[in-house]
Amino acid sequence: MEFYDIVIVGGGPAGLAAAASAKKNKIDKILILERDCELGGILNQCIHNGFGLHTFKEELTGPEYAGRFIKEVKELGIEYRLNTMVMDISTGDESENGSNDKIVTAMNRTDGLFHIAAKTVILAMGCRERARGALNIPGYRPAGIFSAGTAQRLVNIEGYMPGRKVVILGSGDIGLIMARRMTLEGAKVQVVAELMPYSGGLKRNIVQCLDDFNIPLKLSHTVVDIKGRERVEGITLAQVDEHNKPIEGTEEFYECDTLLLSCGLIPENEISKTACVELNPVTSGPVVNESLETNVPGVFACGNVLHVHDLVDYVSEEATAAGRHAAEYVKNGGDKSDDGKEISITATGGVRYTVPSTINTAQMDDTATVRFRVGAVYKNCYIAVYLDDKQLQHRKHPVMAPGEMEQVVLQKKQLIETENPRTITIKIEEA
């Protein structure tokens, strides 16, 4: 059995940033396990620009952004293994050296099935797309139906054109970006349909990818039928009511040979379940504290495996913090101060969830960033933060939408001033 201080599952932007951060915090035995044939994760197929504005103060493409972290990881001498699939993470038994290390079981063509003992594991597996099977779309199963991410890989990496007449269901960021990409490659994007009464993507992507190319966006619409047996020949859209049920008489037929699905992303947590990590039913990601540590001591999570982010810059920021906290865990032997007060964070009044879910004042830095999403579109409302009955923040926002992540920064000095604090509440209040 091999022994490492930190094993990072995933070599995408989160895993790379976490590894570099841990190395800079004086941890030498670090291993990245990546199932793909190269580091970089999803960024390798995101050849559009818009990355790095926060992290590097300049606009980069996805491969350029990933390349900077890959270069840093290699310069720091961090070990990584490609084409390696992690099968299981065990946290219950003692390892060969008598410690309560985590046992990571993985496999690849070179080493076969092998086991690694790690003092700390960082989960950075990213997320996956919601497939057609989860959408209950009626009709046959002809060729020409792709997830937006699959089409993106076919066009940008493999060099294949999925189709010439395209309809896109879902207005997530990948779907919006692929509407522009397919148009630039010569395809005709007939329409982008969205089930909800608001877009699931960033406002800037709606403007740059749809408005600039005169691609129509139909809100509160969904696919009710797919025509074609061997290949998609067309799809039927219908408007939906407030219960997301199709409204009879609103059907519209669009001739097309390709249907792209951009209907949400799901954090990839099958491996997390093997480690008995508690998952948040709203985000489908791990429940973490202020140190990004899960309910399993020594297991940390960051990036899209934790919750789906808008910007990769925020992923890198979060992963850097996870790497630093994991390094502190290793150096302290897992011991923590019991002097602090653990405060739970409650999402209510229009806020769907928060990350983290708890804050321990002894473990937190001088500030703690809490990220969250709202459940509907709000205009001219306030983000209100309360510590029990005491108001800490009351900040006005002109517009908030589910497609854009929000955040508040909590001050440690405000939290420790209160005697026996119990709950931080974050909610939306009307102006």
Pin down the residues of each PLM region:
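Beta1-alpha1 glycine-rich phosphate/pyrophosphate-binding loop at the start
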Residues: 4-68, 72, 76, 153, ...
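Predominantly flavin-linked oxidoreductase catalytic cores and closely associated redox partners
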Residues: 114, 120-217, 224-227, 231, ...
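FAD-binding core/adjacent interface of flavoenzyme oxidoreductases
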Residues: 1-9, 66-165, 241-249, 260, ...
